[in-house]
């Protein structure tokens, strides 16, 4: 994970990092929603 982040920051700059952060947040939110649905 660290290597990927370093490559992204060096090639695409801040925009790439922000996009990666948004994608990670989206994935985490999806996981939380799925877990909550499963618990019902």
UniProtKB/Swiss-Prot annotation:
The segments labelled Required for DVL/RTFL small polypeptide activity in the record are 9-40
GO biological process terms, alphabetically, are: negative regulation of cell population proliferation; shoot system development
Q: Name one GO cellular component term.
A: plasma membrane
Q: Which domain of life does the UniProt lineage start with?
A: Eukaryota
The record ties this protein, via InterPro entries, to: DVL (IPR012552), DVL/RTFL_small_peptides (IPR052153)
Topology within the bilayer: Single-pass membrane protein
User: Any idea where this protein resides?
Assistant: Cell membrane
Q: Which residues are listed as membrane-spanning?
A: 12-28
Which Pfam families does this entry report, sorted A to Z?
A: DVL (PF08137)
Q: Which UniProt keywords apply?
A: Cell membrane, Developmental protein, Membrane, Transmembrane, Transmembrane helix
The UniProt entry's sequence similarity note says: Belongs to the DVL/RTFL small polypeptides family.
Q: Which PANTHER family match?
A: OS01G0525701 PROTEIN, ROTUNDIFOLIA LIKE 8
Function field: Small polypeptide acting as a regulatory molecule which coordinates cellular responses required for differentiation, growth and development, probably by restricting polar cell proliferation in lateral organs and coordinating socket cell recruitment and differentiation at trichome sites.
Q: What is the name attached to this protein's record?
A: Small polypeptide DEVIL 6
* Source organism of the structure: Arabidopsis thaliana
As recorded in Swiss-Prot or TrEMBL, the protein's gene is named DVL6
